[in-house]
Design a protein with these regions (language model features):
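Cell-envelope/glycan interface and biosynthesis
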Residues: 2-229
Length: 229
């Protein structure tokens, strides 16, 4: 995609442009600036009996847009606040908010920064099990893994990584599996502009476009800015 003759670097806060990425694990790419700290976290987890397994990493705008539109069309499952499948609302605004329960607006998911990853403990994953990234997994098979991470995050002992989607912050449901390298993501988000995101949406075939554009200011207060930490 090309928007408004902007430079590639100016589009990076939205998942457009050409970030410097490195493959870290099994086809998952991350921002090159986090690789050293991510390797340290990987080694720390290994020393304590865990195996860091990535389930998602860099996700460009186009991929986020595809996920959003497929959820809007009913091609991907919509989950309620408890992580259970729900019926697709017919009202456009209700549909938008249903998607936002677990999915960020395209260009505002943080995954496009290359600093955020979804993680589980590979050692605790049963053979053949397809990870769903749900709250039940965090409190079930991966509970020990997340408890260890919680302690490291609380002590600022996770090499710059921490959780972003936590209880009491914004209106996206907590995602225990989603961690971010905060020093790098803060730097990359400095160039973010809601007006630019609005112009990108105006030029994009995004589901629920009318209501997104009409509500974008309030959506940003609830679903974007709280996660700029």
């Amino acid at each position: 995609m090309s928007f408004m003759n902007m430079e590639s670097a100016d589009l990076l806060p939205y998942g457009l442009g050409s970030p410097e990425l490195v493959e870290f694990q099994n086809g998952y790419f991350v921002c090159k600036d986090i690789c050293s700290d991510l390797a340290c976290l990987d080694a720390l987890l290994k020393e304590n009996g865990f195996r860091l397994r990535l389930e998602s990493a860099y996700r460009p705008f186009e991929k986020q847009l595809s996920i959003w539109n497929r959820k809007a069309r009913g091609e991907l499952a919509l989950l309620d606040e408890f992580g259970k499948p729900m019926q697709r609302p017919q009202d456009e605004e209700e549909l938008m908010y249903a998607i936002l329960t677990w999915s960020a607006l395209p260009g505002a998911s943080r995954h496009h920064l290359g600093t955020d990853i979804d993680v589980v403990d590979g050692n605790a994953c049963p053979e053949g099990y397809e990870v769903q990234l749900t709250p039940d997994e965090c409190t079930g098979m991966f509970a020990k893994f997340h408890k260890f991470l919680d302690a490291r995050f609380a002590a600022n002992g996770a090499f710059g990584f921490s959780r972003v989607f936590v209880p009491g912050r914004g209106k996206i449901k907590p995602e225990g599996w989603h961690i971010a390298h905060l020093p790098t993501s803060r730097r990359l988000l400095e160039g973010f502009s809601l007006d630019t995101l609005r112009r990108i949406y105006e030029a994009t075939d995004i589901a629920c476009k009318r209501v997104i554009l009409a509500r974008l200011d309030s959506l940003a207060e609830d679903f974007i800015y709280p996660y700029f930490i």
